[in-house]
């Protein structure tokens, strides 16, 4: 395997792992938020605020993975 093949595989692995984990986290956050709102509808604004913040933090991991993959690919 030459260096370009290794870079390609490293880029693919980084993107795969870096997007699967946040997707699972966002799904779990959404399901738990829906459960919480279903049990206590009056707390919906607080739950939604916390949910959006948690989703933003989870999505940041995917953005970091994208940046790392681009560095691997082009540097």
Residue ranges, per PLM feature:
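Hydrophobic alpha-helical transmembrane segments of small proteolipidic membrane proteins, enriched
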Residues: 1-75
């Amino acid at each position: 395997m030459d260096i370009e093949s290794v870079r390609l595989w490293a880029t693919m692995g980084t993107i795969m792992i870096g997007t699967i984990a946040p997707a699972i986290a966002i799904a779990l956050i959404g399901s738990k938020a829906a459960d919480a709102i279903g049990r206590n509808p009056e707390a919906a604004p607080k739950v939604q605020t916390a949910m959006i913040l948690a989703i933003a933090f989870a999505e940041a991991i995917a953005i970091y993975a994208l940046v790392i993959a681009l560095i691997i690919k082009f540097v």
